[in-house]
Swiss-Prot record:
One of its GO terms (molecular function) is metal ion binding. It is found in: Encapsulin nanocompartment. A motif (Di-iron-binding motif) lies at residues 61-64. Fe cation 2 binds at E31, E61, H64. Fe cation 1 binds at E31, E61, H64. This is Encapsulin nanocompartment cargo protein EncC. GO terms for cellular component: encapsulin nanocompartment. It comes from Myxococcus xanthus (strain DK1622). Keywords: Encapsulin nanocompartment, Iron, Iron storage, Metal-binding. The keyword Manganese does not apply. Residues 103-130 are annotated as: Disordered. InterPro entries: Encapsulin_nc, EncFtn-like, Ferritin-like_SF. PANTHER family: PEPTIDASE U56 FAMILY, TYPE 1 ENCAPSULIN SHELL PROTEIN. Belongs to the ferritin-like superfamily.
């Protein structure tokens, strides 16, 4: 009869928040890998029952990844600050702000002026060629 030691994974000490954040990042990686794997399986079959089950499980993995990301934001305030800056940079980029305005996000005393975000500066196929 196979035996498993229920204590085999216990460590002799508790992790610090920094160590836990590193571990949670690996968990996020595993969740994203699972999402990609399930999406590939969905694309590779015509079996509707399998697709439904895979979609359900994939949605759960998406939720897990999101929950882990929220945990990282609490465990690593520096990464949380970068994430907040990224949201602002995304808003500026997609509204056509200048490169300088985007790069100024997070810098001391730098705030994009309203002139940096105008309808005329919206990205178009033509503007990307320049």
């Amino acid at each position: 009869m196979p035996q498993t030691n229920p204590f085999h994974s216990l460590v002799p000490r508790k992790m610090t928040d920094t160590e836990l954040a590193r571990s949670i990042r690996l968990n996020i990686e595993a969740e994203l890998d699972a999402i990609n794997l399930y999406a590939a399986h969905i694309d590779a079959t015509d079996n509707e029952d399998a697709k439904a089950i895979l979609q359900h499980v994939m949605d759960e993995e998406r939720e897990h990844a999101a929950l882990f990301w929220e945990l990282i934001a609490r465990l690593d305030p520096e990464q949380a600050a970068h994430a907040k800056e990224a949201v602002e940079k995304y808003r500026l980029i997609t509204s056509g702000a200048s490169h300088e305005a985007v790069e100024a996000v997070g810098k001391e005393g730098a705030a994009p002026s309203p002139a940096d975000v105008t309808p005329e500066k919206r990205l178009t196929v033509g503007s990307l060629r320049r």
